[in-house]
Design a protein with these regions (language model features):
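Active-site acidic-Proline motif in GNAT/NAT acetyltransferases
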Residues: 88-90, 94, 123-124
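Short, charged, solvent-exposed linker or helix-capping segments at domain edges/interfaces
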Residues: 166-176
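Conserved active-site alpha-helix within GNAT-family acetyltransferase domains
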Residues: 98, 110, 115, 123-155
């Protein structure tokens, strides 16, 4: 399974997945609006185990997340919003929805410095609520009566993204420390050779150093055996 950014060529397949799985449907131009305005925030899950039949064969998209940044946030805080999330029934319970969500949230922080992300979910959608609340850590902000076209209530939810920013900063500090350590190690050994100057360990040491000289007895005078 491959998670990659949404492409404009994916939009017909996205719309098909939306119509197949969700009661909240959108016109194609609505997806295009997201793709052109915030191209970094929307992702698709592609089943790479399905081989392409020809160069014009479309990839098998089994899930997607469509997201955006709130253009004029009422609270003045930059934040993202999940417009639509869907995974085909044949590929559910594989963690795809979680991966799509986390990838989009990371992009919100890296690209737009988003402080939090919001979404709406149907009160009756138990599976989605479990994903958002239990797996991803979203908190319910408030219920919104008759939010959906069929009259069902929605829950407005929110997830603070400061923890992602801290993770990014920690990774950057770790990479900088690692690079500094490598630089220092290179400068210390530059131009130095272990076989010059003082011996280091066993390298460069005379193997005979420290041993007592061996003594041999050499006979002096006439050999008695030779005079016989």
């Amino acid at each position: 399974m491959d998670i990659r950014p949404l492409r404009n060529s994916d939009l017909p397949l996205i719309q098909h997945a939306n119509l197949e799985n969700l009661p909240e449907n959108y016109f194609l131009k609505y997806y295009l609006y997201h793709s052109l305005s915030w191209p970094q925030l929307s992702f698709v899950a592609v089943d790479v185990s399905r081989p392409s039949q020809d160069p014009y064969d479309y990839p098998k998209i089994v899930g997607y997340v469509i997201a955006k940044m709130e253009e004029e946030p009422s609270d003045g805080i930059p934040h993202g919003h999940i417009t639509s999330l869907s995974v085909m029934r044949t590929h559910r319970r594989l963690g795809i929805a979680e991966k799509l969500m986390r990838q989009s949230q990371l992009a919100m922080v890296e690209t737009y410095q988003a402080r939090y992300v919001s979404l709406h979910v149907r009160v009756s959608n138990v599976a989605a609520r479990h994903l958002y609340e239990t797996t991803l850590g979203f908190k319910i902000e408030k219920p919104e009566a008759k939010y959906y076209a069929d009259g069902e209530d929605a829950l407005s939810m929110r997830l603070d993204l400061d923890y992602i920013k801290k993770q990014i900063e920690a990774e950057e500090e770790s990479e900088e420390a690692s690079a500094a350590a490598q630089t220092n190690g290179s400068s210390k050994t530059n131009g130095e050779h272990l076989d010059e100057g003082e011996a280091v360990g066993e390298v460069g040491r005379d193997p005979e150093a420290g041993k007592k000289p061996m003594k041999f007895k050499i006979p002096v005078g006439r050999n008695k055996e030779a005079s016989k």
